[in-house]
């Protein structure tokens, strides 16, 4: 059975234990051989924060140092460019075999507005969707719900048997840490060392990254 590669995109502003522990849990449960962290400098569906992409990348590198599960992709890091998942997946598929199983990891909260993503139906032509639990408000969209229902599988082993096209809902624990909460903690002088690796905490304090309101 082929092992999966997975892409985990996000702002990572900052990267924290919620990201890292979730990724490691998914890798263990579903036999993911490599997780590619995909920091997005200019996400199309959320407000851009003040942290520079170079600082985000540095924090990611510090957090995953000597962890062979992870690597970083720089495909969505160009300054002032808006990046869309479908375009990034096409670029990634040009670099890896079209026969290699690939997952794109997103939270249930983002799945609720997935129909707003560029060419959202085409994403399954390039990868599976691996959904992790996240608190969210239910949004009704019949077209999206039918699409999810028709492509969802309940056996994670099926993700290894074809390169793309399936949706799988993980039963990983719900993440109760958010980057926005951590940024606010630093702004108000609250300690966040338990929420992220100490080396990342030290970098934030050294650079005074979140001392202005974001």
Swiss-Prot record:
Gene3D superfamilies: HUPs. One of its GO terms (molecular function) is ATP binding. One of its GO terms (biological process) is NAD biosynthetic process. Catalyzes the reversible adenylation of nicotinate mononucleotide (NaMN) to nicotinic acid adenine dinucleotide (NaAD). Belongs to the NadD family. It catalyses: nicotinate beta-D-ribonucleotide + ATP + H(+) = deamido-NAD(+) + diphosphate. Its EC number is 2.7.7.18. The keyword Nucleotidyltransferase applies. Pathway: Cofactor biosynthesis; NAD(+) biosynthesis; deamido-NAD(+) from nicotinate D-ribonucleotide: step 1/1. This is Probable nicotinate-nucleotide adenylyltransferase. Keywords: ATP-binding, NAD, Nucleotide-binding, Nucleotidyltransferase, Pyridine nucleotide biosynthesis, Transferase. Signal peptide: none annotated.
């Amino acid at each position: 059975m082929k092992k999966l590669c997975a892409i985990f995109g996000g702002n990572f502003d900052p990267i924290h234990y919620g990201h890292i522990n979730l990724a490691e849990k998914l890798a263990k449960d579903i036999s993911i051989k490599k997780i590619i962290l995909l920091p997005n400098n200019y996400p199309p569906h959320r407000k851009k924060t003040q942290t520079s992409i170079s600082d985000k990348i540095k924090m990611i590198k510090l957090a995953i140092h000597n962890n062979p599960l992870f690597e970083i992709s720089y495909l969505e890091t160009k300054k002032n460019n808006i990046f869309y998942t479908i375009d990034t997946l096409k670029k990634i598929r040009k670099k890896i075999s079209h026969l290699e199983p690939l997952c794109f990891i997103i939270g249930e909260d983002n799945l609720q507005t997935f129909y707003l993503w560029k060419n959202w139906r085409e994403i399954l032509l390039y990868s599976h969707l691996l959904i992790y639990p996240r608190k969210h408000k239910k949004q009704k969209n019949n077209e999206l719900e039918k699409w999810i229902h028709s492509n969802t599988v309940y056996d994670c082993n099926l993700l290894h048997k074809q390169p793309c096209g399936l949706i799988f809902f993980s039963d990983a624990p719900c993440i109760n840490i958010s980057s926005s909460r951590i940024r606010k903690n630093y702004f108000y002088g609250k300690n966040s060392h338990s929420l992220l690796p100490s080396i990342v905490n030290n970098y934030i304090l050294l650079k005074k990254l979140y001392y202005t309101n974001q």
